[in-house]
Amino acid sequence: MKKIFFLIYIFLNFSFAYSENIELKSREDVEIENIESQIKVLEDKIQTIKKLKNNKNKDDLKVALVLSGGGIKGYAHLGVLRVLERENIKIDYITGTSIGALVGTLYSIGYSIDDIEKVLDIINVENFLETGSDTTNLPLDKKESLKKYSLYVNFDNELNFSLPKGLKGNRETYLVVKNLLKNYANIKNFDDFPIPLRIIATNLNTGETKAFSKGDISKILIASMAIPTIFEPVEIDGNTYVDGLVSRNLPVEEAYDMGADLVVASDIGAPIVKKDNYNILSVLNQISTIQSSNITKVSREKASILISPDVKDISAIDSSKKNDLINLGKVAAEQQIAKIKELPKSSSNRKIVKNIEDKKEKFVINKIEYNK
C-alpha cells in the first residue's frame, strides 16, 4: 500500500511540474513582453541621445527662434530680437505663426529690426486696422462691431443665397506682403533663405498643423494670418488653410523637427479671459482660445528658453502702444539674459537687405495670379 501511495505522489508531482512547463501564454503576458521591449528600446535611445549630447561642441549647437501669433502685440517680438542681436546670438532656424510668421519671415530674409518695425506699421495702419487682421486677440463680439465688418450675402441668378467664407477678404494684404517680399518671390524652398524658415497654418479640413517649407511665401503668410470667421480661408494645393494659432500658436515642435538643438520661444499669445455674458461669436472665440492655450502649454514646456512678454493688458487693436510692446519684449528677454548668454554666438554679421525708404511706397501690379 505504501508503494502505491508513493507512486501516486511521484506521479502527481511530475504532472504539476509538467503542467507548469506547458502553461499557455496569456494576453497579459504578451502585453508585458511588448512593454518591456519598448522600455528597452527607449532606454537604449536615451543612452544614445545622452552620448550625442555629451559629444557635441557648444558652438556647434543649432538654435531656433520661435515666434507666436498675437496680432499687433507682435511688436513685442522686436524687443526680443534686439536683445538677441545685442548678445550676438546665432539663429539657425526660425518658425512662426500668424504675426510671428511675418516677423520671422522678414528677419529670415535679412530685414533689419528697424525695417521690420516699419513693415508692421504699414500692415497695421494701412491694412490690418482696416481689414481686421490685427484683432487676433480681440473677442469676436468686439470684432463684430467694427465698422468694416458688414456681413454680406451672395445671390446667384436663381436667387439662391450663400454666406461668405469670412467677413473680410485678404487680397489687399496679400498684395502688400507680395510687394514686401518681391526680391524673394523666385525662392520657393524656405530652406534656401539666409535663415531656414517654417510658416505655420492650420488645415481647415483636418485640423492638423501644417509647417510650410516651400511655396508662394506671400500666400502662405496670408494663410497663417487668416483668422477664422474674420478672413476668408486660403486654398493652397487643394487644401484649405486658416490661422496657425488654431492648431499651433507656438511652433516649438516644428523647430526641433528642423534640426534645432536649442529653442528660444517668444510667446505673446492671448490668455483665457473670463466673461460674464456670452453670445455665439464670443463662444466661438473662447473655444478657439482655450484650444490654443492647451496646445501652447505643452509647447512652452518644450522650449529651452521661454520668453513671455507681459502684453495681456495692452489692447490688441491699439497700435499707439507699439513702443510699450517693444519695450515689454525687451524686458521679458532681459529676464532670461543669464540663459541667453549661454547660447552659441554668431561668427559673422547678419546680412541686411536694402532698407525701406518710404513706408508709403507706391507700387504697380501688372498681373495678379491668386488661385482660389
Show where each model-derived region lies.
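Sec-dependent N-terminal signal peptides
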Residues: 4-13
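Patatin-like phospholipase
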Residues: 18-97, 105-372
